[in-house]
Amino acid sequence: MDFNLNDEQELFVAGIRELMASENWEAYFAECDRDSVYPERFVKALADMGIDSLLIPEEHGGLDAGFVTLAAVWMELGRLGAPTYVLYQLPGGFNTFLREGTQEQIDKIMAFRGTGKQMWNSAITEPGAGSDVGSLKTTYTRRNGKIYLNGSKCFITSSAYTPYIVVMARDGASPDKPVYTEWFVDMSKPGIKVTKLEKLGLRMDSCCEITFDDVELDEKDMFGREGNGFNSVKEEFDHERFLVALTNYGTAMCAFEDAARYANQRVQFGEAIGRFQLIQEKFAHMAIKLNSMKNMLYEAAWKADNGTITSGDAAMCKYFCANAAFEVVDSAMQVLGGVGIAGNHRISRFWRDLRVDRVSGGSDEMQILTLGRAVLKQYR
């Protein structure tokens, strides 16, 4: 596996560097984080570069650049301080619809290309069904030629502003043998109530509770095939976990570089603190973790481009990178001392964001379970 970037990939990365140097994005990110506001202006700038077309097939007007290119772009964005967690639907969200959606649904989502606006997200988690997705209670029932959606979802990302969501629900007419199906829901429909929740980190992307009270749908609003709900989201879950891991690496690399520059400049006891062995030890451990993350992610991206990536690979990336990145940021914060925990240094935002990522997108514990099963399955 050769992970040297080709000319096209180098151009993308160079474009990212140019964009990030074009203005004081950090001040904008800090404001959006403080106010829990989606950074639409920044996402629009990325969309203008074609980032939202990276994985779209050429026959649909996309670049079909592949996952290694995506990884290189994501890592560089994160290294330069961008909140890449707000972009999870940007590269893969269109492909989900190209794979599962009707032409009408595809047209509605593809209209968001190049806009930078939030377009859709999945609504699966419920108050009583987090990791145990088989315990979903939200139902769809058929009455008089219509579909009626009832129940509630919680911790649903992007749902404060997104115009559409894809809701996982069970057939209310089949209580003994659950049938799970996804539905494409226009958020402007009557009977939908959205309550925004406050959270520790990842504050630039909304997190909401959504209730459905006899929300009326049509058969054409079915997303994918009836009864195929869990199968259709499996690839989406794996894709999300890979993107979370890429975000973790980029954020950790940014914190590492901030701390390294500080260690070489901060003078105590007559010399730069970077000359002290205990500080050097921290950087040695951070560098080992960062290098391990990077190699793991590029291998996973290569597998994705060659059609060999598995759910176990995605779980390994998600678990290792979420934990290693948090440890790197925590160590970097220790190096920064009071500067890192007081005032407005971005490392405090990184610390909060990475702590959330050990829960969101699949908890640490669920990644370990998924990976353990995948490993043992190879030896049956």
Swiss-Prot record:
CDD domains linked: ACAD
Gene Ontology cellular component annotations, sorted alphabetically: cytoplasm
Database matches in Pfam families: Acyl-CoA_dh_1, Acyl-CoA_dh_M, Acyl-CoA_dh_N
Cofactor: FAD
Subcellular locations according to the entry: Cytoplasm
Gene Ontology BP terms: carnitine metabolic process
Entry EC no(s): 1.3.8.13
Major enzyme class: oxidoreductase
Keyword Protease among UniProt keywords: no
UniProt keyword list: Cytoplasm, FAD, Flavoprotein, Oxidoreductase
Record text on subunit structure and interactions: Homotetramer.
Known function: Catalyzes the reduction of crotonobetainyl-CoA to gamma-butyrobetainyl-CoA.
Family: Belongs to the acyl-CoA dehydrogenase family.
Protein's UniProt name: Crotonobetainyl-CoA reductase
Species the sequence originates in: Shigella flexneri serotype 5b (strain 8401)
